[in-house]
Curated annotation (Swiss-Prot):
This is Beta-benincasin. It comes from Benincasa hispida. Inhibits cell-free translation in rabbit reticulocyte lysate system. It comes from the Eukaryota. IC(50) of 320 pM in rabbit reticulocyte. One of its GO terms (biological process) is negative regulation of translation.
Amino acid sequence: RDWRREQERRQERR
C-alpha cells in the first residue's frame, strides 16, 4: 500500500 498517496488524498478532503 502507498501511505504517501493516502496522505496526498487526505489533503484534498473537500
